[in-house]
Amino acid sequence: MNNIILLPQAQRVNNIEDAVILDEFKAENHFIEANTQEVTFEHLKNDCITPVFAKDNELTINHADFIETIEDATRTFFHSQKVGTPNIRVSHVIKGRIPEAVRKPASQLLDSDKTIYYERAAFSIDIPTVFETIMGNKLNLSIVGVRAYNQMNLYSKKSPELFRLAIGFKNQVCCNMCIFTDGYKEDLRVTSTNELYRAALELFNSFNPARQLQLLHSLGNTTMNEHQFCQILGKMRLYQCLPNYYQRNIPKMLLTDTQINSVAKAYINDENFSSFGEDINMWKFYNLLTGANKSSYIDSFLDRSLNTTQIALGINAALHGDEKYRWFIS
C-alpha cells in the first residue's frame, strides 16, 4: 500500500501508515444505475420543492442541503486534498401543481405551474489524491450519501430524519464501491444540518483505510476454480428459499436472484473481471458482486454494498478454513 495517504495528520496520526498522493481527477462513471438518473446540484436546489412533516408543516432537510452539508464536511476534513464535485443520482420523481393550476388540463400546464421533488437521492464525492492500486485497478477514496423519503414517516410531526453515509473506496475501472463496517453509518438520524455535519466529521475521523486496503489486497491472493464459483452461486440462489430459522444460522446475504444472475453473466462477459474457463481470484469475484449491486434501488444500495464486502471476505476466509461462511462453499 504505497499510494495511500490518509486523513489529516493532526487528527489521524496513529492510522496513517503508508502514504503518497498525486494523481489527476478523472470524470467518473455511474456508481449506481438501476432506475436512477443524473441531476445537477443546481436542479435540486432551485427547481425542487422541499417536503414537510404533515402534522406541523416543519421542513425536512432536503436533498440539496444534505449534499451541500456533506460536501462542506468533506472539504473541511480533507482540506489538504483535492475533492471532486458531487455526482448525484435520483429516482422516484414526485410531481405536483401549484394551487392556481389545480384545474388546468395537463396539456396546458406551464413549467411554472408544476412542482417536483425526488423521493430518493444518492451522491458520491471522490477524493482522487487519496488512492491505492489493487490488481491493476486504481481505487479512489470516495464518500457516498443516500437519502430516501420513503423510509420516513412524513405524516407525523417533525422528528429525527434518517440518512445513510459511507466512506470507502471506488474502483475507477468500473465505479464499484468498496464499503466496510467502520466506514458506514446506516442509521444516521439528525434534526439539523449542524448535527449532520458533525456526524460526517466523526465518521471520517473513525475511518481506518489502511485496514480496509489490507483486506482488499488479500483478496487477490486467493483463487477458486469454476466448480467452486458455481457452487457459491448455487448456494446464494438457495439462500433466498431457505426458511427463516435456517437463514438465522447463516451469514446474511442480501443480493437478489436477478443480481446473482448478473454475477454469472459478468463471470463470462465482463470486460474487466470475467474469468470464464479459468480460475477466478477473489478480487475479481468481489467486483462481480459489487458490479451486480449497482442495479440496486437507491434505498438499499449501501446496505448491499457493505454486504457484498462481507460476503467476499467471508468466503475468502472460508476457502482458507474459516467456518463462518463455510456453508456457501460446502
Regions from the language model: what does each represent?
Residues 1-25, 105-330:
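Intrinsically disordered, low-complexity regions enriched in serine/threonine
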Residues 76-115, 119-122:
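A short acidic/basic microdomain associated with nuclease active sites
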Residues 1-71, 77-82, 86-90:
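Feature for intrinsically disordered/low-complexity regulatory segments and propeptides
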